Structure formats: C-alpha cells, structure tokens
C-alpha cells in the first residue's frame, strides 16, 4: 500500500515542527506482520538530541471518537542522540496500539517498553503527555475520515509509575516539571 495523502500531510507537519534533515526507517514487529515508519531528525531541537515521530500510526484506532470522527495519534519524542534504543521504544509503543489494540491518551502509561531494550536505566516505562516541545507546530489535523493529534513519549521510572498509579498522571507530570528533569536523558535518575 502506498503512502496516503493524509500521511504525506502528517509527515510534512512533523518535519515542519522538527526542522532539519529527516531519515525515515521502517520497523517490523517480531512476526513481520505489522510495520511502522519512524521519522528521525538529528540535532533537533538542539545539538546532541534526536527528534522522532511515528508515521502512519494514525491509520490505526485508539478507540476514541470526537463528534463521530475517529481521533487518531502519532507519537513524537526527543532523546539524547547517544541513546540508540529510542526508535525501537517508539515502534514497540506503536505495535501495542496496532497489534494489541492498546488505547492511548495523555497520562496513559505503557509499561516496560524501555526495559525491553535497556535494563541498566532507571527509566522503564513510557507516559504519554501533550507534545509540549512542539505545541505551537503540532496542532490537530482534520481529515475527512479522521482527526490526528500528537502525543509525546516521556520515559518514567518504576517509582514514578507508582506515584502515577497512586496520585494520578497529572500529579506525576507536575512533580516531574517541579524537579526540572532532563527529558532528553533516558539515563536520568528517578525523582522518587
């Protein structure tokens, strides 16, 4: 199946937000049944950081509708370029939606998607948050058959997961912001 017009618009929108020179890599699930394209741009939004976005995830349902129109997502992230696992982490998040029908919204946590690739870091899970790094540029896209928005994949630790489970994801987001965590550092220490 070729690239749809909608996905071309999505790719242009993401590239407009990220800037720089894009690279697109196709990732396959373990059974080679499903694939997802991951766009990456090195040294964006700053030197030593790579920005990522899924392309085509919005072709799959997250089980949400707004006024009768399916709401779909693409996942964005930014991580130290030295980390070579983050595209894999994003593809695993995408396959959770594509193959396992996970739902996804702000505050939702996908467990153990980092620890699958790196057991040495405190960061184990992904919490989805609004894409605050690019909020000016990644606005809702309205198509005839779907609306597309973006969620940012934010690494969290086991302790931070427990805080979210006890007090809610908004509480955890406020805590992470108050501690001024380095969102680009997958090896950062847990705040709890």
From Swiss-Prot:
This protein's UniProt keywords? Cytoplasm
* Location(s) in or outside the cell: Cytoplasm
Q: What happens when the gene is disrupted?
A: Deletion of the yqcF-yqcG operon has no visible growth phenotype, however it is out-competed by wild-type cells.
Q: Which gene encodes it?
A: yqcF
Assembly description? Probably interacts with cognate toxin YqcG but not with other non-cognate toxins. The interaction inhibits the toxic activity of YqcG.
Q: Which domain of life is it from?
A: Bacteria
A single Gene Ontology CC annotation of this entry is:
cytoplasm
Q: What biological function has been recorded for the protein in this entry?
A: Immunity component of one of 6 LXG toxin-immunity modules in this strain. They promote kin selection, mediate competition in biofilms, and drive spatial segregation of different strains, indicating that LXG toxins may help avoid warfare between strains in biofilms. Mediates intercellular competition during biofilm formation; disruption of the operon disadvantages the bacteria, but overexpression of the cognate immunity protein restores growth in competition with wild-type. In situ neutralizes the toxic effect of cognate toxin YqcG.
Q: Does the keyword Cytoplasm apply?
A: yes
The protein in question is named: Immunity protein YqcF
The UniProt record describes its induction as: Expressed on rich and minimal solid media likely in early stationary phase; dependent on DegSU. Not expressed in liquid LB, but only under conditions that promote biofilm formation.
| InterPro entries given in the database record | SUFU-like_domain (IPR020941)
